[in-house]
Each structure stands twice: as C-alpha cells, then as structure tokens.
From Swiss-Prot:
GO cellular component entries: membrane raft; plasma membrane
TM annotation in the entry: 17-37, 283-303
Pfam families: dCache_1, HAMP, MCPsignal
Residues covered by the HAMP domain: 304-356
Role noted for this protein: Chemotactic-signal transducers respond to changes in the concentration of attractants and repellents in the environment, transduce a signal from the outside to the inside of the cell, and facilitate sensory adaptation through the variation of the level of methylation. All amino acids serve as attractants in B.subtilis, they appear to cause an increase in the turnover methyl groups, leading to methylation of an unidentified acceptor, while repellents have been shown to cause a decrease in methyl group turnover. The methyl groups are added by a methyltransferase and removed by a methylesterase.
Record domain Methyl-accepting transducer: where: 375-611
Protein name listed in UniProt: Methyl-accepting chemotaxis protein McpB
Cytoplasmic topological domain: 1-16, 304-662
Residues with PTM Glutamate methyl ester (Gln): 371, 595
Keyword Transmembrane helix: yes
C-alpha cells in the first residue's frame, strides 16, 4: 500500500489517466453490484414472504370454507328445532335421525347434540354419557346462551373418545329454549397446514384468540404463546413482523380467521434470504473481476496511445527549446496530437531556415566589418603620412614640391580607400536590411504557428463540448433502460404470482400457467437485454469520460506549446531589434564616409592650389593640416564604428550558435 501511495505522489498524465479510468470502471460496477444485491435481497424477501402470505391466506380460506359449512348446518338446526322437539321420545328420536343423517354424509363431523333448558339432552351418534350428565352445566351450552344467538366456536381440544383434535360449534335455539352443538375433527386441516412451506426451513402454525397454540411444529396444542412478538401479532388482524427467537432472526406473515378468531401464521429464518442473495453477490464479484481485467487491458492500451505521443512531443519540445532545431517529431496518428506534431515540425523547419539565413548575414557583416577596419587602418596611415608631409613641407620651401606630389599621391590612395570603405559600407547596409527582413519573416512564421496552435486549442474545446453532449445523452438512455428493467422485473413478479394462482386452480389453470411461464421468460429476457444494453451504455459513458480527460490533457499540452512558441517569438523580436540597431549604425557610418570623401576632395583641391600658388603655401598648408587632422579624426571614428560593428556581429553570431540547424 505504501509503495502504491508513493507511486501516486509522482505526478504524470499516465498515472492520472490510469487512476481515473480505474475509478470510472470500478465505482459504477460496485454501485451497481451493491444496488443489485440490495434489490435482489428485497425482491427475494418480497417473493418468499408473498408466497408465504398466499399460502397462509389460502389456508385461512380453506378453514373458513370448511368450518363455515358446518356453522351453516348448526344455524339450520338452531332455527328448525324448538322446545317441543325435546319433549317426548318420538320427537327426540326424530332429532337423532336428522343428526345421524348429517354426520353420516359429512366427513369430519364427530357428533351433533342438543340440550334444552329443562335438562333434556339428545346426541347422535349415541355414546355412553357420565351418570347425571346435565348439558346446562357444560361450557358449550353456557357460552352459546351468553352469545345471544351468535355462533360460538370453542378452542380446539383432544376428544376423550378417540384422541382426535376437535372443536365445538354451538348456537342458541331461535326460541331460546336450548342449544344445538356440533363437534368437528380438525386433524385434516392440521395436516394441510403442515404442508405449507415458508422458504426452505420455515413453517406455519395456528394460535387461538386466547393466545394458545392449536398446532405448532415445536409446541403442544394448548400451550401458551410467549415472547415479545406475541403482542405485536395480536395488535393487528394481519400483517408482517420481524423478531428474534433463540438468537435467530425470523420473519412472520399472519392473518386472523374471521369465523374462529384463530391466528394463522407462517414464519421463516432471515438467513434463508441472505443465503439466496449470495449467488447474486458471487455473480456480481465475478463480473467485477472480469470487468477490471478486461477494462485494465483496454485502459493500458488507451493510456499508452495517449502518453507515448505526448512523451515524444514533450521530449522534442525540450530539445528544440535548448536550441537543437534538427529535432523532428514523429507522430503517425491522425488526431489532434498528429496535427500538433506536424505544426511543431513545420515551425522547426521555418526556424532552421531563418537561423541559417541570419548566420549567413552575420558572417557577411563580420567579414565586411573586418574589411572596413583594415581599410580604415590604411586610410589612417595615409592620413598620418599626409600630416607628416605637410609638417615637412612647412619646414622648408625646398622640399615643398616633393611633399606636394607625395601628398597628392597619398590623397589619391586615400580616395581609393574611401571608395572601398564606401562600397563595403553599402554592402554591409544591404546585408543588414536583408537580415532585418529575414528576422521579420521569422516573426511572421512564429505568429502563424501561434495562430495554428490557437485554432487547434479551439478545435479541442469544441470536440470536448460535443463529447460532453454525448455523455448527457448516454446517461438519459441509461435512465430509460433502468425504467425498462424495472418494468421487466414487475412483469416477472406478476408472472410468478399468476403461475401460483394457476397452480392453485389445478387442471383448469394449466393453460394459464403455461402462458404465465412464457410471460415470465419474456420478462427475464427483456431484463437481461436491458441490462446488456445498460452495460454497453456504461462502457460508452466510460469511453466518453476517457475522451474528456484526453481533451483536457491535450489542451494543457497545447497551452505548453503556446508558451514555447511565445518564447521563440520573443527571441526573434530580440534579433529583429538588434538588426535594426545594426542598420542604424551602418547608416551613421555611411554618412561619416560621405563626409570624409567630401573632405578628401577639399584636401585634394588644397594640394592643387599649393602647386599653383606658392605664395599662398603657408595658408594652404594650414588648411591642409586642418583638413588632415579632421580626416584623421574621421578615420578614427570610422575605425571605432567598425570595431563596434564587429563586436555586435560577433554577439549576434554567438546568439545564433545556440541554435543547431544541421
């Protein structure tokens, strides 16, 4: 874990992409797995408890139908019998015959009997009674007389005659002269109750309204109910409740039989729902692992396809920023990264051409500066010779003619030197102007590159906006698929309920059961298809998110390219400024050379005047001396300017040496 954290602390685009993609891959799957597990647990709970409730309700209906028919018979006898029916032996025999006939044709009826308010008792079939038996002292008689003509159903009890579980249904005679009652065996009902399955290990039980067991898997009949859940169950006529019994969580569904007041309940262990849901969890984990493996391979491929060109682009940009203009960027993709690589290559080619032209111009300027310096030196020496000749001429008239000729010869040499200086200065000026134009062209190339980089940036932002739109639409489709999936689940549940109802209907519902099964299969297929589509949409959303991260990183790299291009632009602006400054110096030097040429002509005219007018030699010599001194000062200025020009050319050469073009 510590190694992974240290790995994350080192920032890189590949790490960011890998972490982002893995998070986008795992988080939705975990959320979907958690929600699927919760949903499956809830649906299994609803399905199992729904089946249990249906079984309990069905058994409750069976109890009502079975005992209801017997209660109607008791009501019939209570309305047809009167006080006179118990008087006289013939009347009593007639009653017994009716009772016997009903017992013989109705299974589950143990006996029918009646008692009058005078103590008379009639029963069928005939059984031996205790001596002094008085029906008026029996609970069934007393409860019925207190009920005011309503049906009375006793709690179940074990019959002393045959050990069967029976209940008694009793009702007061219509004229109030006695009570008629019927003992009914409920062993068959109890056997049906034992067949009720609630989950795998759950069971059903019956309790009386007096909170005693009628039938239970682990308790005897008549045993009192105990536990916190008892009060909750008797608080409502029907419902569901959760409770803990013997440190085990259980869930119960129950209802109340209207005729008997019994509580009919089905209970199961909560662990069954958890065990049934484990298969969903296991399947989800398998899907998660498979998705991580497949997604990881795809993520590595995508990350490498993005970061590999970016690394080459960054490395080449650093090489170019260090002055190596021979570097080329090889990106063969046709996307924005490929276009950016082509733009960098075009910029490098433009820079190489520009630097090469500048170096040629600088070499020409340096050579011309050296020639100018040499010519200025020669001219300075000639001027010194003229000055010395004038001084010698002023010392004696005898040497005047020779000095004048020597001065005339030196002036001719000086004129030739000045013409050479003028031509060299003109060449340097042209080279400087050409360098300025080339620097301006380079600056335009850089500005065009900046414009193209900005265009790429706008294209990336527009593509990012389009991808975001696709992401929103994909999420809308996912929402619709979830609705379809919910409808399919509901259809599946309805089909299961229909199959249960068809199973209860027996042979008459077999066709409906087949149709329900087909509907359930279609619902399952629809749900599976919806899940597959939802999975595909989620993969599309993940790829869209990947594209968005790619656009952001490309946008950042484009911004870095803009910074590098701006730095290059500033360098060319500096070169352009220096070439302009050199052009200004050259123009100043041209003006100085022109002035020097004019002065040289004046000196030549003065020397000619010396040859023609000897009398004015003294004044002419002074003029020549003054002109010679001015000429010497001008030559020193030219020499200084040439030196400065040579230094500036050397500095410009040093600047261009930073760039490698071959």
């Amino acid at each position: 874990m510590k190694t992974f954290i240290n790995w994350l602390k080192k920032p890189s685009i590949s790490k960011k992409l890998i972490v982002s993609f893995i998070a986008i891959l795992i988080i939705p799957i975990l959320i979907l797995e958690f929600s699927s597990y919760r949903s499956a647990s809830g649906k299994l709970d609803q399905e199992i408890m729904g089946n249990a409730k249906n079984s309990v309700d069905t058994f409750n209906t069976t109890v009502t139908n079975d005992l209801g028919e017997k209660a109607k018979a008791v009501t019939f006898f209570s309305e047809s019998l009167k006080r006179s029916a118990f008087k006289g032996k013939s009347n009593q025999e007639e009653i017994k015959a009716k009772f016997s006939q009903y017992v013989s044709i109705n299974q589950g009826v143990a006996r029918i009997y009646g008692g009058a308010d005078n103590g008379t008792y009639v029963q069928a079939p005939k059984e031996k009674l205790p001596e002094g038996y008085d029906p008026r002292q029996r609970p069934w008689y007393q409860d019925a007389m207190k009920a005011g003509g309503e049906i009375v159903v006793t709690d179940p009890y074990v019959a002393a005659s045959d050990g069967s579980m029976v209940i008694t249904i009793a009702q007061e005679l219509k004229d109030g002269s006695g009570v008629v009652a019927m003992d009914i065996t409920i062993d068959k009902l109890l056997e049906q109750m034992k067949q009720i399955k609630v989950g795998k290990e759950g069971y059903a039980f019956i309790a009386t309204k007096n909170k005693t067991y009628v039938a239970h898997k682990n308790h005897k009949a008549g045993e009192k109910l105990s536990g916190d859940w008892v009060a909750k169950m008797y608080a409502n006529d029907s419902g569901e409740l959760q409770y803990t019994l013997n440190n085990e969580d259980k869930k119960m569904t129950y209802t109340t039989n209207e005729l008997t007041g019994w509580k009919i309940a089905g209970t199961m262990y909560m662990d069954e729902i958890k065990d049934a849901s484990k298969s969903v969890l296991t399947t989800g984990m398998i899907v998660l692992i498979a998705s991580i493996v497949a997604g990881g391979i795809l993520i590595l491929f995508i990350v490498r396809s993005i970061t590999k060109p970016l690394k080459r682009l960054v490395q080449s940009s650093k090489t170019i920023s260090r002055g190596d203009l021979t570097e080329t960027i090889e990106i063969h993709s046709k996307d924005e990264l490929g276009e950016l690589g082509e733009s960098f290559n075009e910029m490098g080619q433009s820079l190489r051409s520009l630097i090469s032209a500048i170096q040629d111009s600088v070499n020409n300027v340096a050579a011309s500066s050296e020639q100018l310096t040499a010519s200025a030196g020669q001219t300075s020496k000639a001027t010194e010779h003229i000055t010395m000749a004038i001084e010698q001429f002023s010392n004696g008239n005898e040497e005047q003619s020779e000095k004048v000729e020597s001065s005339s010869h030196q002036l001719n040499l000086m004129n030739e030197g000045l013409q050479q200086v003028s031509q060299t200065s003109s060449d340097i000026t042209k080279a400087s102007i050409q360098s300025t134009e080339i620097a301006g062209t380079g600056e335009k190339f850089v500005q065009q590159t900046v414009g193209q980089m900005n265009s790429i940036n706008q294209s990336v932002q527009q593509a990012e906006a389009v991808v975001k739109g696709l992401e929103g639409k994909s999420k809308d489709i996912t929402s619709i698929l979830r609705v379809i999936n919910g409808i399919a689940d509901q259809t599946n549940l309805l089909a299961l309920n229909a199959a249960i109802e068809a199973a209860r209907a027996g042979e008459s519902g077999r066709g409906f059961s087949v149709v329900a099964e087909e509907v359930r299969k279609l619902a399952v297929q629809s749900a599976d298809s919806a899940k597959e589509i939802e999975k595909l949409i989620q993969e599309i959303v993940a790829e869209i998110d990947t594209s968005l991260h790619m656009f952001k990183e490309v946008n950042q790299e484009v911004q870095s390219g803009l910074v590098v291009t701006d730095n290059t632009k500033e360098s060319f602006q500096s070169i352009f400024s220096m070439t302009n400054e050199i052009a200004g110096k050259l123009q100043t030097m041209n003006s100085t050379v022109e002035q020097l040429s004019d002065r040289s002509q004046h000196v030549s005219a003065a020397v000619s005047g010396i040859a023609d007018v000897s009398k004015e030699s003294s004044a002419s010599i002074q003029d020549i001396a003054a002109s010679a001194e001015e000429q010497l000062a001008s030559m020193e200025e030219i020499s200084s300017s040439a030196t400065t020009l040579a230094q500036m050319a050397e500095e410009l050469r040093d600047l261009t040496k930073q760039f490698k073009i071959e």
